Amino acid sequence: MTKPFLLEIGLEEMPAHVVMPSIQQLEKRVRDFLEEQHLEFGQLKTYATPRRLAILIEDLADKQADIHEEAKGPAKKIALDAEGNWSKAAQGFVRGQGLTTDDITFKELKGVEYVYVEKSIIGKPVEAILPELKAVIMAMTFPTRMHWADYDFEYIRPIHWIIALLDDEVIDFSILNVTTGRTTQGHRFLGQEVTLAKATDYEAALEAQFVIADEAKRQNLIQTQIEKMAQENDWQVDLDANLLEEVTNLVEWPTAFYGQFDAKYLEIPEEVLITSMKDNQRYFYARSQAGDLLPVFIGVRNGNDAFMENVIAGNEKVLTARLEDADFFYHEDQKVTIAENVAKLQNVSFHDKIGSLAEKMTRVGLIAQFLGQKFGLSEAELVDLQRASDIYKFDLVTGMVGEFAELQGVMGEKYALLQGETPAVATAVREHYMPISAEGALPATKVGAVLAIADKFDSMADFFAVGMIPSGSNDPYALRRQAYGIVRILENQDWHFPMADFQAAMSHIVKQQADFDLDWSANAAAISDFLTDRVRQRFNGMRPKVRRDIVDAVLKNQGQDPVVMFEAAKVLSAHQDDADFKATIEAITRVLRLAEKVDFETTDLTVDPALFENDAEKALYTAVEDLRGATATNTLAENYAALQTLRPLIEAYFDATMVMAEDEAVRRNRLTQLMIIAQIALSLGDLNELIVK
């Protein structure tokens, strides 16, 4: 027999961004609990609003499944003493199983007889198990927690009521001073308290009290209302998924409305208007069919349409105040030159242990020029890069960015253009922040990409130099994200730069020309390892997924060049299912293991054919020499193809040749031959890491 079960946790209003993660966590914890308790169940239906987290479990079994299992004990020779009596080992075993020696049987396993017992565990009724959900509720974790009254217990928000209803029966337990019941709360202003007769009444009963508990249903309603509004007014509305989810989790009874603002504010850059509407007020914005931003906003009220004119007027007043501030800052900022703003940066601290923003910009300018030349930027691009690096943080001291921090870079681009900077320079000022999120958009221009890498590397090296290295989940300055951004930009631009060389070159430049008492060389190895970890992170995010052993292999690429690593992984992944992949890798790894035994200088790898003692050596030598000239300019795909070609010759070579010959000259000659092949293989990484079956 099965019954529905409802669990609802009633809370004070939660922040919108934790509602969905919280209900997902609760669902997983409840599901795991039911499975651990051997309780069969049907569908789990979740409900979530700012004031409640709830789960309706359909077809919950009325008792645990009975468990019949067999337990293996000691070997028979240990279970019985010399007189055939039960030993202490046997008696202790059955006592631990809750049985007696009368329950023992013997079974043979791999030629040895062992003690076995069979035991049955009769399932408990579900009513006896469900009170343990108290521990599930209390074990939940949240990004921020609070305590209330005099309780030591902390939760996302104070708990005000709990429903635990098995069909029509309340399951009793308490958390702090809150005891389970069958009563829930309707909308804070429109609804009333409602008592449920049975669990399945939940959704309909709440809807009658102005609460749409189903998050998907609430979101669909908002979307439908806004789309209807847009159609009636011939608007285009960007229903941003993140904003839609946030608004959905701010309300229990959504009613969309629209208001207007003075068209004079359209003179302000639209990014400012959109930020004011979307990020600050949680409004959707609208465009004309021609794509022009319109002086209207769309909001969602947590309530019905009563007195909507007052709601609209209030929202218009709040937005107008924000836009008036923005208009003021926009015009006041233009009275200050870029040079004046840059001068102010000498008094703006980047970090008290590192120095000012002006000092950071000096370092970044040097790094950017070095990188720009390394990556082949044109003379004109290098000129733009120099100018961009001289000014790129100037907007941080403007009034607009002081009020709307999320517009840093965006306003820098706008103001730079207004003051006569070239489009390339202005764009780089904006792009140097990119990617803003881990998988966000990348700089589209080379100048912006170089400046972004230089700025991010400087930040990373600065904090490492003063010992502020990320550990565990502690990364207050987002250095992992910035390093990951470097890796993604290098990949996107196909720019080659070995990480160890990168660090050494940067340290030298800064030490010589912009020291500012920062020792970048102290943590050079740590920075290289940190970047390598971000390359691994990039691999983990790739689809189709790259095999872990392939990742391990290419991360040991001698040059530590991220772009080469990505290409090597692509090549190995393309061949991992080849019929000869196993044989090729086994042959090459044998070469690599012997090459590791080389104990002499390998800068001049010259093989002497006069020392060959068999035809297999000659055949391999001829094939390698034919390939050797091309491998320096080969692609990695061509290098792998060369290894495939050499594979049968390598196998024949090992069949006929003792590499570690007693004669030193012969041994060195053979190891040199293998070192040449090893160098081709090492261009792909350390193939010893590959697992082939």
Curated annotation (Swiss-Prot):
It catalyses: tRNA(Gly) + glycine + ATP = glycyl-tRNA(Gly) + AMP + diphosphate. InterPro entries: DALR_anticod-bd, Gly-tRNA-synth_bsu, Gly-tRNA-synth_heterodimer. It is found in: Cytoplasm. The keyword Aminoacyl-tRNA synthetase applies. GO terms for cellular component: cytosol. Coiled coil: none annotated. The keyword Ligase applies. Its EC number is 6.1.1.14. Its main location: cytoplasm. Keywords: Aminoacyl-tRNA synthetase, ATP-binding, Cytoplasm, Ligase, Nucleotide-binding, Protein biosynthesis. It comes from the Bacteria. It is an enzyme of class 6 (ligase). GO terms for molecular function: arginine-tRNA ligase activity; ATP binding; glycine-tRNA ligase activity. GO terms for biological process: arginyl-tRNA aminoacylation; glycyl-tRNA aminoacylation. Tetramer of two alpha and two beta subunits. Belongs to the class-II aminoacyl-tRNA synthetase family. PANTHER family: GLYCINE--TRNA LIGASE, CHLOROPLASTIC_MITOCHONDRIAL 2, GLYCYL-TRNA SYNTHETASE. NCBIfam families: glyS. This is Glycine--tRNA ligase beta subunit. The lineage of its organism: Bacteria, Bacillati, Bacillota, Bacilli, Lactobacillales. The gene is glyS.
